[in-house]
């Protein structure tokens, strides 16, 4: 491990503030060090704990980051002027025209071409697209400034 790496300096460089984060300081330290390709055992040695504890801290941190992403996506959904539900079984090439039509109706300009929109969907929801078909119900939201957010939806929804 590079002895010159200081977790405090890493966190200061990115402006981490534990009071404003869903991560604990220790979780942020572990993630920052892992992003610098430091092995868990070396991080444990640096922070005075076991590799197993570092593994647990990292796993919890990544879960917290994913929960935060989902929370932001939910908050964006509440204010997005464009919300499009895509059913499982939909041909992926039907998605862009559907999204663009909804955006036109709302007077919102989407910032993605068809191929980039489909790539965004595929990247956002694991297993969403297989063999040119949507595998899980999706919610596609577009903000006033054209930013697209994609979430997988539960197949069971109550009205």
From Swiss-Prot:
InterPro entries assigned to the protein according to its UniProt record, in alphabetical order: RNA_pol_sigma70_r4 (IPR007630), Tfx_C (IPR029291), Tfx_DNA-bd_arc (IPR004645), Tfx_DNA-bd_euryarc (IPR018384), Tfx_DNA-bd_sf_arc (IPR036657)
Keywords: DNA-binding, Transcription, Transcription regulation
Organism: Haloarcula marismortui (strain ATCC 43049 / DSM 3752 / JCM 8966 / VKM B-1809) (Halobacterium marismortui)
GO BP, one annotated term: DNA-templated transcription initiation
The protein, known as: Putative transcriptional regulatory protein rrnAC0199
Function, in words: Putative transcriptional regulator.
UniProt family annotation: Belongs to the Tfx family.
GO MF terms held by the record: DNA binding; DNA-binding transcription factor activity
Origin: domain of life: Archaea
NCBIfam families on file: PRK03975.1-1 (NF003054), PRK03975.1-2 (NF003055), tfx (TIGR00721)
């Amino acid at each position: 491990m590079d002895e010159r790496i200081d977790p405090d300096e890493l966190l200061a460089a990115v402006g981490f503030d534990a009071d404003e984060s869903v991560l604990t300081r220790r979780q942020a330290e572990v993630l920052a060090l892992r992003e610098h390709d430091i092995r868990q055992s070396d991080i444990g040695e640096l922070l005075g704990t076991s590799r197993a504890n570092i593994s647990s801290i990292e796993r919890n941190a990544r879960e917290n980051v994913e929960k935060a992403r989902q929370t932001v996506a939910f908050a964006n959904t509440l204010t997005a002027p464009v919300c499009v539900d895509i059913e499982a079984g939909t041909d992926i090439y039907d998605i862009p025209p559907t999204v663009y039509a909804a955006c036109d109706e709302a007077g919102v300009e989407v910032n993605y071409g068809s191929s980039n929109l489909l790539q965004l969907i595929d990247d956002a929801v694991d297993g969403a697209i297989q063999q040119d078909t949507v595998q899980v119900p999706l919610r596609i939201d577009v903000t006033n400034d054209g930013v697209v957010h994609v979430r997988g939806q539960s197949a069971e929804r109550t009205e």
